[in-house]
Amino acid sequence: MEDSRLLITLILVFGVIFLKKFFQSNQHPSAQRLSATGVNAHGRPQGSTQNALRRTGRVNGGHPVTTQMVETVQNLAPNLHPEQIRYSLENTGSVEETVERYLRGDEFSFPPGFEPSRAPMGANAAVDNNAAGGGEFNDPRKKNMICAENLLDKFHVDLNEDMSNLSFKDLDIEERKRLLVWQARKNLETKLQSDKDLQSLLT
């Protein structure tokens, strides 16, 4: 009799655990954190946050924006001014769309009548602004990272040295780099001798 009661109790306990697991939300942890802050997975306010926004309303008629929405975007785009983020969120109504715009490299404008040079900024934005010398904000995605580099100097390749008899498989990584640069330069020299159009471009 006691064995059957124990068996029924165990079945009930495992049944409850199984049902809990089965009906548990299979959201990603970041989506669960967003729902806890009052923003849904699409970046729109929900629950008590949405009710509070409905009560307060927006003066300019745009989408309602919470400070959590602005902070979420600011964490991903620290070089944007909070007013740029707020204005974009008022237009799109979604954190997700605003972040996608940022990742695409779209321009973020300030609200009409807003003076960016007089606005309070975070420490990072102030440093960037001072470095730029004024009201322009630096965008690290728009820096030109391409610069001409002389590979002969970089890998210490001597063109007078004859490397044609070296075996590629026997060399270490640095020597292979030197050999590849040397071969590319020699191939260019031979091509320049035969191709008059290419020669005219370089002279």
Curated annotation (Swiss-Prot):
The gene is CUE1. It is found in: Endoplasmic reticulum membrane. GO terms for molecular function: ubiquitin binding; ubiquitin-protein transferase activator activity. The chain crosses the membrane at residues 7-23. Residues 36-61 are annotated as: Disordered. One of its GO terms (biological process) is establishment of protein localization to endoplasmic reticulum membrane. The keyword Transmembrane applies. Forms a heterodimer with UBC7. Interacts with SSM4/DOA10 and UBX2/SEL1. It is a single-pass membrane protein. Residues 1-6 are lumenal. GO terms for cellular component: CUE1-UBC7 ubiquitin-conjugating enzyme complex; Doa10p ubiquitin ligase complex; endoplasmic reticulum; endoplasmic reticulum membrane; Hrd1p ubiquitin ligase ERAD-L complex; mitochondrion. The keyword RNA-binding does not apply. Present with 589 molecules/cell in log phase SD medium. This is Coupling of ubiquitin conjugation to ER degradation protein 1. CDD domains: CUE_Cue1p_like (cd14424). Residues 24-203 are cytoplasmic. Belongs to the CUE1 family. Gene3D superfamilies: 1.10.287.4310, DNA helicase RuvA subunit, C-terminal domain. Keywords: Endoplasmic reticulum, Membrane, Transmembrane, Transmembrane helix, Ubl conjugation pathway. Component of the endoplasmic reticulum-associated protein degradation (ERAD) pathway. Recruits the soluble ubiquitin-conjugating enzyme UBC7 to the cytoplasmic face of the endoplasmic reticulum membrane where it functions in degradation of misfolded or regulated proteins localized in the endoplasmic reticulum (ER) lumen or membrane via the ubiquitin-proteasome system. Residues 65-107 form the CUE domain.
